[in-house]
């Protein structure tokens, strides 16, 4: 029976008996259920419940680590571990009721395994009885927001109770999910490099102004394109490590509750097709006028392709409504943002800008790039991914159109469709064990066959020994306990969790500060992935 159902049954019994004290005694369980709706014991791969039988007798400690083994991007932004620590591991992670529920699914012939000799509930009972349900685990990690080149250790995990050596890698399943916010934050940051590059090349703004404006260039449109609210929360917050624009409001809850920050992703009033088509094709211009009148100041966006984006730009925005648009305050932050939403993104934008420049005029900045009047801009939110953004900017560059005229909305390609665990080849592996008091290195080094039939060593080779992440002039490197100077080397991995207690929390502002794109990174910006 789940913890939630157990609580409900006990509350019903207490109410029937008029036993108020019994209800008060349930408060710890109620708080656990509210904080932890998922049973941690069930948050692992089925095969892991058998591992206690495979470890050699006398196994006292297992030391494992997380790394990106290399992938699409050369660096990763470490972000999101604090989410999983707070939501799954902190405090009382396992209760007696959790163990009972897990046994219902795993413990006997009617369970997952169809046998009663796989799941050993005494392993979990021991944690409840000996440690009060707190996990005897130590985790050290690089500070969140740190940009680390791939093929380096990002966190280590080991058990602190020799009777719980099996627990280290049992937690792999839930902790490895950190690949998701890391990869979203990394992708978002790579887009940011491209945006900064073109702002520096095509605008007249100084560095501080570019830093501010770029915050609003890539907007998260991804909520509807992900598989769950949890994905929207975690992935949406990862995007906000780099940018400020977002329609994924739920991401702010993570920032507030997990990262102790009042930072908010910024959104703007905007229409959708249900609004623009509500009066039919003939009434589209009326809805456009209404959009301008409802929000005469500030930013307002209007989807304009319900029937004909080119007519909308030439006859409506650039014709009958032109003077109303230009009557908006000329100060930044008061523009109408025209949104095409169909067709080839680059070719559509090329024609849209041609029409808008013709109807509204433009100025030419000191670098020779065209700039629309401050009252009107364009957003592209359809068909947007890192490659199409680079392609669009390259086209605008050729056409001498300044990057400041355009912002982007990126949906499923930001939070789901273009990323998975193998985007950066994330893995958690054991690297060191202690058996009967003796430390041993652990390593995997597969031999594989490539597409040409050649036998080669796999990129999946793991690291061995106890690990440290060391900062160098070129970034970071991982050293092992076999390397000379290991004991004296400064480890960038800091203790963040031990025995149920979070030892170090990062604020969202600290995370964003560490993830800032550095000037030296802009010397060569990759645009094709």
Enumerate the predicted regions with their spans.
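Exposed alpha-helical structural elements
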Residues: 6, 22-25, 80-84, 88, ...
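Buried, small/hydrophobic-residue-enriched core segments of structured protein domains
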Residues: 27-73, 110, 122-136, 140, ...
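Gly/Ser/Thr/Ala-enriched C-terminal appendages of enzymes
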Residues: 32-87, 91, 243-244, 248-254, ...
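N-terminal, Lys/Arg-enriched amphipathic/low-complexity engagement segments
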Residues: 63-130
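Short glycine-rich, low-complexity/disordered patches
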Residues: 118, 189, 525-529
């Amino acid at each position: 029976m789940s913890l939630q159902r157990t609580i409900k049954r006990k509350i019903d019994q207490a109410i029937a008996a008029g036993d108020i004290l019994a209800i008060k005694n349930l408060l710890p369980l109620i708080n656990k259920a509210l904080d932890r709706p998922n049973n941690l014991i069930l948050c692992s791969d089925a095969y892991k419940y058998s591992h206690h039988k495979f470890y050699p007798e006398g196994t006292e400690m297992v030391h494992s680590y997380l790394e990106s083994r290399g992938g699409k991007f050369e660096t990763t932004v470490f972000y999101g571990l604090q989410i999983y620590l707070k939501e799954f591991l902190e405090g009382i992670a396992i209760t007696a009721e959790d163990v009972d529920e897990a046994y219902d699914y795993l413990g006997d012939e009617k369970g997952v395994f169809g046998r009663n000799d796989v799941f050993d509930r005494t392993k979990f009972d021991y944690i409840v009885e000996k440690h009060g349900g707190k996990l005897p685990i130590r985790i050290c990690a690089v500070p969140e927001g740190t940009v680390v080149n791939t093929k380096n250790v990002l966190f280590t995990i080991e058990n602190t109770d020799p009777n719980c050596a099996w627990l280290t890698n049992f937690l792999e399943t839930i902790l490895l999910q950190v690949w998701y916010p890391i990869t979203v934050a990394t992708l978002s940051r790579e887009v940011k490099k491209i945006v900064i590059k073109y702002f520096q090349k095509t605008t007249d703004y100084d560095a501080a102004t570019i830093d501010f404006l770029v915050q609003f260039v890539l907007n998260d449109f991804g909520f509807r394109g992900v598989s769950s609210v949890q994905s929207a929360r975690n992935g949406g917050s990862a995007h906000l490590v780099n940018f400020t624009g977002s329609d994924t409001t739920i991401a702010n809850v993570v920032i507030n509750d997990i990262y102790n920050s009042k930072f908010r992703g910024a959104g703007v009033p905007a229409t959708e097709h249900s609004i623009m088509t509500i009066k039919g094709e003939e009434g589209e211009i009326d809805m456009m006028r209404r959009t301008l009148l409802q929000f005469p100041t500030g930013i307002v966006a209007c989807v304009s392709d319900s029937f004909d984006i080119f007519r909308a730009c030439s006859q409506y925005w650039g014709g009958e409504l032109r003077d109303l648009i230009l009557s908006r305050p000329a100060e930044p932050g008061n523009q109408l943002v025209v949104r095409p939403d169909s067709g080839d993104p680059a070719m559509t934008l090329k024609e849209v800008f041609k029409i808008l420049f013709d109807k509204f005029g433009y100025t030419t900045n000191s670098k020779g790039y065209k700039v629309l009047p401050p009252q009107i801009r364009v957003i592209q939110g359809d068909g947007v991914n890192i490659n199409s953004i680079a392609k669009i900017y390259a086209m605008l560059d050729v056409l001498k159109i300044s990057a400041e005229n355009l912002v982007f909305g990126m949906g499923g390609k930001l939070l789901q469709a273009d990323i998975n665990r193998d985007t950066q080849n994330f893995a958690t592996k054991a690297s060191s064990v202690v058996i009967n008091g003796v430390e041993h290195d652990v390593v995997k080094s597969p031999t594989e066959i490539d597409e040409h039939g050649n036998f080669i060593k796999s990129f999946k080779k793991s690291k061995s020994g106890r690990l440290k992440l060391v900062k160098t002039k070129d970034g970071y490197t991982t050293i092992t306990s076999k390397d000379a100077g290991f004991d004296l080397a400064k480890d960038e991995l800091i203790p963040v969790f031990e025995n149920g207690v979070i030892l170090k929390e990062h604020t969202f502002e600290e995370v964003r500060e560490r993830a800032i794109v550095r000037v030296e990174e802009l010397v060569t910006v990759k645009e094709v992935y």
